[in-house]
Amino acid sequence: MSDPMLDPITMRADWAEPDGVLANYVSLTDQLVEHVDPGTPFTLTVGGLVVDGELIPQWQWFAELSELNDHEDAYYVGMAEYVKELSDLAHTAVKKRDIGEEISFRQYQALSVPTRYIHLRDARISRPGQATGVTGRLWRGRLRDVSGWTPGRADA
C-alpha cells in the first residue's frame, strides 16, 4: 500500500488550494464593515511577478473601483452593494454566533462563501530585477495563484 501523501494526484490537489493562512486573513478582512484606510500592507508572488499593496475588503475594492468613473458603471456599483451586503451579513452572523444566538440562513450562506480572491489598493506590479513597477492600481487576484507572500511592502 502506498502513502497517500506521496500520491501524485493528492499532491497536485493540495497545490490547487490557496495558502490557508493567507486565505483566512483575507476572509477576516473581507468581513470588516468599516472602510479600511490604510489597508494592511502585503507583498505577494504571483506567476513570477511581485505584487505589493494594501489589503482591503472585497466590498471596499468594488466601491473604490466604482468611484474611479464617478459611479457611471452600474455593474461595479451593483457588485459593490452586493458584496457589502454579504460582508454585513457575515459580520452580523459572527457577532450573533459568538454570543450564542442563532443565525439566519442568509447569514449562514454569507459565512459559507469561500474566499477566492485577494484585493489590494495602491498595488505595484513588478518583475524580479525591475526597479519599480506600475503603481497606484486597484488589483484583484486569485488566492490559489499566490505562490508566496509576506506582510509589508516590498520597499519597506
Spans of model-derived segments:
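Conserved RNA-binding domains used in RNP assembly and mRNA/RNA metabolism
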Residues: S2-A156
